[in-house]
Amino acid sequence: MSTIAKDQTQINDRIRAKELRLIGHDGEQLGVKTKFEAIEIAERVNLDVVLVAPNAKPPVAKIMDYGKFKFEQQKKEKEARKKQKVVTVKEIRLSPTIEDHDFNTKLKNARKFLEKEDKVKVSIRFRGRAITHKEFGQRVLEKFAEECKDLATVEQKPKMDGRSMFLMLAPIVDKKQN
């Protein structure tokens, strides 16, 4: 029966409300009680009064084991964090006049990234007068997207940004794996 909560949860004597709508440890409604009556009832069964809905009128409190409640809350948060996936964006840089072997090497690397479910940004930097032949870069990016279509979808079509043209590929994720 601790009365000190390290987070913002109000328990036992730390509850500021004078009256509470009380829920018993087995889930039954005990009605509106004063804070002191609620604490007295909780002490009889060796449990804590925990404020679960502070903004309700009157605030809702439940009789429960605070330590167990806190443990369950942490477990739920841990599960939620485990299910989250951080999406990383990997960049592959090409040139508008890339040779076939270099293209295939970059393609192989991009496919590895897509298999790991990372997004891939494919960019082409135009140097000097090459900017006048944007269609070369466009063709290279379209060929790259075509080669990856079994693993990825085009999230953003080839687009110019200053002296660079880029394409964004997102992995195709199977819903069955999750």
From Swiss-Prot:
* Gene Ontology, cellular component aspect: cytosol; membrane
Description of how the protein assembles with itself and partners: Monomer.
List the GO biological process terms.
Answer: ribosome disassembly
- MF annotations from Gene Ontology: ribosome binding; translation initiation factor activity
Q: Which organism is it from?
A: Macrococcus caseolyticus (strain JCSC5402) (Macrococcoides caseolyticum)
Where is it localised? Cytoplasm
What keywords would UniProt list here? Cytoplasm, Initiation factor, Protein biosynthesis
Protein name according to UniProt: Translation initiation factor IF-3
- General function of this protein: IF-3 binds to the 30S ribosomal subunit and shifts the equilibrium between 70S ribosomes and their 50S and 30S subunits in favor of the free subunits, thus enhancing the availability of 30S subunits on which protein synthesis initiation begins.
Query: InterPro entries attached here?
Result: T_IF-3_C_sf (IPR036788), T_IF-3_N_sf (IPR036787), Translation_initiation_fac3_CS (IPR019813), Translation_initiation_fac_3 (IPR001288), Translation_initiation_fac_3_C (IPR019815), Translation_initiation_fac_3_N (IPR019814)
Q: Tell me the protein family, please.
A: Belongs to the IF-3 family.
Q: Name one Pfam family in it.
A: IF3_N
Look up keyword Transferase and say if it applies: no
Q: Which SUPFAM superfamilies match?
A: Translation initiation factor IF3, C-terminal domain, Translation initiation factor IF3, N-terminal domain
Where this protein primarily resides, as one coarse class? Answer: cytoplasm
